A protein has these predicted regions:
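Ligand-binding grooves and catalytic loops that recognize ribose/phosphate and carbohydrate rings
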Residues: 79-107, 113, 169-173
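Beta-hairpin (beta-strand-turn-beta-strand) motif
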Residues: 56, 78-80, 113-116, 138
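A generic secondary-structure micro-motif detector
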Residues: 30, 112-113
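Terminal accessory/targeting
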Residues: 1-70, 99, 103-107, 119-132, ...
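Glycine-rich phosphate-binding "P-loop"
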Residues: 19-29, 75-92, 221-222
């Protein structure tokens, strides 16, 4: 078995091939409640792995994340209302949204937009805010053999990711093998959402059915899915990565 290490997104160097032997755990916070985020942090703490968190809002848990030298913070701006805009809404501009998040996470070097919204103009603006790594490109592991990061024209680095829990749900990939996925060649960036980890989401329908209780810790926990779901897959993955770091 090839020895594998977990690393953060900002540790990727396109000029060096070390990223091929690493696994990158990333998390889209998506306005999750603190008890949901804390659950993901607790699971990660069992194995002392590296991770990158794409932040949507301020929370006291940022202090805990910053205190761990193996964690880093990126930003997760939501530009959807700029695209699907309602004329009656008072909508913030792209720069206002970036200002807001960079005030919360001034050290952020990476970005993954909500819904992976991206454009050449957005890349120019990201660069203005000292963002060096764009993670807005997904190439699903089951549609290609090998992917790699690449340098963009503005000297930013594009970091495609090849596993996302919500895309797995959309494709209904219930029986996917985390050992096989984690052993594939090329860049291995995984994207999870704490809300799906907490719920152990097994389908989009299950997630949608529980939306109204996502802020109710007791009810949300009571509705955690018993059969194999996102939480189970995540635990399988981090156990695999941890075993390879020994």
């Amino acid at each position: 078995m090839i020895k594998t290490y977990s690393e953060t997104i900002s540790e990727i160097n396109v000029e060096k091939m070390g990223w091929e032997r690493s696994i990158y755990l990333t998390f889209d916070i998506d306005w999750a409640s603190d008890f949901v985020i804390a659950d993901t942090l607790e699971l990660l703490s069992r194995f002392n792995l590296s991770a990158t968190f794409f932040i949507t809002h301020d929370t006291p848990l940022l202090k805990e994340i910053r205190a761990n030298p193996r964690y880093e913070l990126g930003i997760h701006p939501n530009f959807n209302d700029l695209i699907f805009r309602d004329g009656n809404q008072d909508i913030k501009t792209v720069r206002e949204k970036m200002d807001e998040l960079k005030q919360i996470v001034p050290e952020a070097l990476s970005v993954r937009s909500h819904s992976t919204t991206n454009s050449s103009k957005l890349l120019e603006i990201f660069q203005e805010y000292d963002i060096q790594f764009d993670c807005n490109y997904i190439i699903p592991y089951h549609v290609t053999d090998k992917i790699a990061p690449w340098r963009l024209w503005n000297d930013m680095t594009r970091i495609p990711y090849y596993y996302s829990d919500d895309l797995s749900l959309a494709y209904n990939l219930v029986d996917e093998s985390m050992p096989q996925i984690s052993e594939r060649e090329g860049l291995k960036v995984f994207d999870f959402h704490p809300v799906h980890i907490y719920l152990n989401t097994d389908s989009i329908a299950t997630y949608e059915k529980t939306r109204d209780i996502h802020r109710n810790e007791k009810l949300f926990l009571q509705n955690r899915v018993a059969k194999r779901g996102t939480r189970d897959k995540f635990l399988e993955l981090i156990e695999i990565v941890a075993s390879r770091e020994l």
